[in-house]
Amino acid sequence: MDITKSLNCRELRDCDVVDSDGQKVGRINDMTFTFDGQLKLEQFVLAGSAWEEFLESIKIKPDRDPLFDASMIRRIGDKVQLESNVNTLKTTLDKGAIPKGEIRWSELSKKQIVDLEEVTIGKAIDIDFDIDGTASLTVGGGMIEETLEKIGLKDDIDIIVPAETIDSIGDQIKLKVSKDELKLTMDQALENPEVRAVKDSRDVHRGVVKVRLFHKPR
């Protein structure tokens, strides 16, 4: 899978999905992930009129969730390009289409994030995909939102926490680090020149700057 730029779930949901024949299949409505020390994208859930028309043509109710595996993706850029055509896709009618252990983004985004002592940190407001394919949490709410509001950058900064800092995902997302450690790391990251430049050009700045915590060069 070739990822041409860093992007997130929010941006992916705006992308058209095109099959190997160049046919527009629909748009991404949801995604599934697994976690085993790394957050791994597994499947996409589609929506859109083109897909619904196809389901109707093969006598399947269009309210079922069509899926395709992440391994079927050739390239992600302005569009999501698939290796296969629409006829090879599956739906949640298929037994085991979403295996046990996979979790939908729509469910993950409702979970609270807690530190190693189970103190609430905030929520996962998005998942960020770097060009090397690694996935990380974009964290908001709670102390994250409070800190960004204090410096007037709530809408200008995304705080990215790598999957390596996640201990487990169950009823909540538990981190391996403490709230104080996270806060200290974030405060240090917000002092970098790129963030200061956002502060100085707030009136003309239009993009969102991604601030990666606990970042280790690859």
Residue ranges and their predicted role:
Residues 1-218:
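Peripheral interaction segments used for macromolecular assembly
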